[in-house]
A protein has these predicted regions:
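Intrinsically disordered, low-complexity repeat tracts enriched in Gly/Pro/Ser/Thr and acidic residues
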Residues: 1-333
Length: 333
């Protein structure tokens, strides 16, 4: 790096020091913080899809069982009991109707020719399909709720063998409408679904404490949203396929902020940094790096206007000091 006879070495030293600090400081949140969104956990999705294989119960061999045997299967452990109790107010009506309306219909044990054993207690239609309110158990997966023509339909609670569960609206045995998804005894998503994918407004929570609030489409973060990091930092703006995309702003915990156009999770195009001490940089970025023309303005009013290539200052530049009315041109090779 060389300079052409700078009139004031203090300005150059200040510029160099500030530029080096900015060049190597971690001003962006690491990519690893952006957790890719997904549809329902595969374990839950598989359990839902393994239901009736689109067959009615009539051609499948089934046996009556006692209420005691059915209840022992349903209440297989304390975890399931606690989950059911959590939604007792919503499930009371369903369980009451099963007890009263279907009192004369015994629970059944179903031998599925495609494998597995199913248990069911509830209503049927004339075709022998599960219809109305009922309780269904298969491979330690439990569904308590409404059925229509052998499909989960309406409000229902689905509990997996591992104790993860979904409570909310169903249509055609898919999560459709508003619902809550719990994993490892913690709420991981609350919001809207379409065909078992997150769609519409929702709130997603992550194991490390991060939270996303905003729009989803096809199971991914798409549209406007807010990603709040566990340390208090946050991103407000647009997303595409679960990455920063479009205009957005990152507000860091210490008070610094980054604002501009993002693409594929990185700053691309016009943007600006504002530090808590009042220092500001405005310029062009490519993949999170300063590229092209930009200007630094320090809190004391001094400024430097110049060019960058991959975060490195090069070429002609102009330093201004409005406090004493001086300015100087420099060349950095």
């Amino acid at each position: 790096m060389g300079c052409e006879s700078p009139k004031n070495t203090e300005n150059v030293d200040l510029l160099t020091s500030k530029a080096e600090n900015l060049q190597y400081s971690q001003v962006f949140l690491p990519d690893s913080q952006i957790i890719e969104s997904s549809t329902l956990p595969s374990e839950l999705n598989h359990a839902i899809k393994s239901k009736f294989n689109k067959q009615s119960l009539i051609p499948i061999k089934f046996f009556e069982i006692t209420e005691e045997e059915f209840n022992s299967i349903l209440n297989r452990n304390e975890l399931v009991d606690n989950i059911i109790k959590l939604y007792s107010s919503q499930l009371d009506e369903i369980e009451y109707e099963i007890d009263v309306k279907y009192r004369e219909i015994p629970p059944i044990k179903v031998l599925d020719p495609k494998g597995g054993i199913q248990y069911y207690k509830g209503g049927f239609n004339r075709q022998g399909e599960c219809h109305g309110k009922g309780i269904w158990v298969k491979d330690y997966n439990i569904y308590i709720g409404n059925f229509r023509n052998d499909e989960f339909y309406g409000i229902g609670l689905f509990i997996t063998e591992q104790g993860n569960y979904y409570f909310g609206n169903w249509k055609n045995s898919q999560c459709n409408g508003y619902g809550s998804l719990m994993m490892d005894k913690k709420l991981v998503y609350q919001g809207n679904f379409k065909d078992s994918k997150k769609e519409g407004y929702g709130e997603e929570r992550y194991p490390d404490g991060d939270i996303y609030k905003g729009a989803f489409y096809d199971g991914e973060k798409n549209g406007k949203g807010q990603y709040i990091f566990a340390d208090g930092s946050r991103y407000d703006g647009n997303f595409r396929n679960s990455k920063y995309s479009g205009f957005g702003q990152i507000s860091l915990r210490g008070g610094d902020s980054i604002r501009g156009e993002f693409k594929d999770g990185k700053l691309n195009g016009d943007g600006d940094f504002t530090w808590v001490d009042g220092t500001k940089f405005v310029g062009n970025f490519v993949d999170d790096k300063k590229n092209g023309e930009g200007i630094y303005v320090w809190s004391n009013g001094k400024s430097f206007k110049g060019n960058w290539n991959n975060n490195v200052i090069y070429g002609n530049g102009l330093i201004k000091n409005p406090n004493n009315g001086t300015q100087e041109s420099i060349i950095i090779n």
